[in-house]
Amino acid sequence: MPSETAQAGEGPAGCPHLSGAQGSDRSLDQRPPGNKDAPERVWIRPDVPSRCTWELGRPVADSPHQHAALAKSPKILPDILQKIGDTPMVRINKIGKNFGLKCELLAKCEFFNAGGSVKDRISLRMIEDAERAGTLRPGDTIIEPTSGNTGIGLALAAAVKGYRCIIVMPEKMSLEKVDVLRALGAEIVRTPTNARFDSPESHVGVAWRLKQEIPNSHILDQYRNASNPLAHYDTTAEEILQQCDGKLDMLVASAGTGGTITGIARKLKEKCPGCQIIGVDPEGSILAEPEELNQTEVTAYEVEGIGYDFIPTVLDRTVVDRWFKSTDKEAFAFARMLIAQEGLLCGGSAGSAVAVAVKAAQELQEGQRCVVILPDSVRNYMSKFLSDRWMLQKGFLEEEELSVKRPWWWHLRVQELSLSVPLTVLPGVTCSDTIDILRGKGFDQAPVVDETGEILGMVTLGNMLSSLLAGKVQPSDQVCKVLYKQFKQIRLTDTLGALSHILEMDHFALVVHEQIQYGGDEQPSKRQTVFGVVTAMDLLHFVASRGQDQQ
């Protein structure tokens, strides 16, 4: 995969995508937007324009990168890193038939990699390329902003090779990923899920700050590192071609950093030019083309490892023939289907890919073949989409789909509860005063609203006290600095059963009421106001007091 010759002082593995932090001004965003007085911030954006010079038809001999041929594995592997790659291709039998496909539907099962995901390939490739370039040396520290799977791959390789590993990941990522990372010896830093990628508080921003503070540390940077798509160009794509004897008519892959679909697609365009490349992007992400596909009211999504709010440098959208958007609901439904009907223990993003595959492959005929990439394992999501409770709480599963006998109160509405007048706090109130107010009123939490009543977030005693003790805030700081935004909302018309599912995982739920607001000639807008805060104790009190009347 040809690329410009690396320049002196460039990033890991001599990658032409990576101009060093002291290099091109185009890669530097030294101060947060609109704040010229802020301290200088040194980082490299994950969406800088690509400098890769790969062209269809250009000889691989012109490439500055090292390309190794696929090798047969020995009977006894020298270490677990040799079990990365050579993943099986499995025929999907029932799902394709049930959705009326005429073509053959095959799954490339990347969860058979040593660390459980397709990201093991790029993790090992980035490290080995950096070692060959002399960038990464014994005793150095690897830092990486990641949704979890790349982190697991890097932590696995770091454990075997002896590097210190620090993984920076958003809060929405599953606890299972965190537990696996800790078991592998990685240090973990969590960042707010809703932080924009270019914010200093994002997983990207925090990783670059740590790099400035820790000597001999490196961000291999999957978003810009040419080793990312190269891993798939040299191995994943070659395996697919060998397993299919060079015959495939469509490839479907979801996109996160874009390295998987870019690397595979470039090789297939060279060796199997008639193969259609189908990209999968979740609703709420902006990777798909044309841009109209990305227009949605969805601002967040639960499926992990795919989609972004920026276009990563390594994503080459010119090699994708068509994009499809996927929803959380269909992603998790298809992931469960793959497990239940095909015995494939895959993750949610695999469900996204297969949901799109059964749509895109409708045009294929008998004798044609569609290959879909299943990126990771269900291991990382045992407490998420594998759980009926989680699926019900998120609205991805209906009560009617579960044949379980429910208690007498299950279908009653939240409005049946005796909710007290809500206590709210303005964002300018200090942490010290807020603690006094909550303790004085006997509350553990309160909504933070602005002057118009719009909900900004929640503040909890536990969150405030831990932030104060950790030195993140001072007692005199405004409470808006410790807003808690990972809370659940429920409406008065929702059932107590739905509330029960929330309270099994959370200490409270915010009861909200929707209003339609008109502002003169402007279009009406929906806004939410606080009706109350409900806790498990409120529900238990209601059940106990009304239960006697039911007997």
Swiss-Prot record:
Residues 1-41 are annotated as: Disordered. One of its GO terms (cellular component) is cytoplasm. It comes from the Eukaryota. The keyword Lyase applies. One of its GO terms (molecular function) is cystathionine beta-synthase activity. Heme binds at residues 52, 65. Its EC number is 4.2.1.22. Residues 418-476 form the CBS domain. It is found in: Cytoplasm; Nucleus. Pfam families: CBS (PF00571), PALP (PF00291). It catalyses: L-homocysteine + L-serine = L,L-cystathionine + H2O. The modification N6-(pyridoxal phosphate)lysine is found at residue 119. Hydro-lyase catalyzing the first step of the transsulfuration pathway, where the hydroxyl group of L-serine is displaced by L-homocysteine in a beta-replacement reaction to form L-cystathionine, the precursor of L-cysteine. This catabolic route allows the elimination of L-methionine and the toxic metabolite L-homocysteine. Also involved in the production of hydrogen sulfide, a gasotransmitter with signaling and cytoprotective effects on neurons. Belongs to the cysteine synthase/cystathionine beta-synthase family. NCBIfam families: cysta_beta. This is Cystathionine beta-synthase. It comes from Oryctolagus cuniculus (Rabbit).
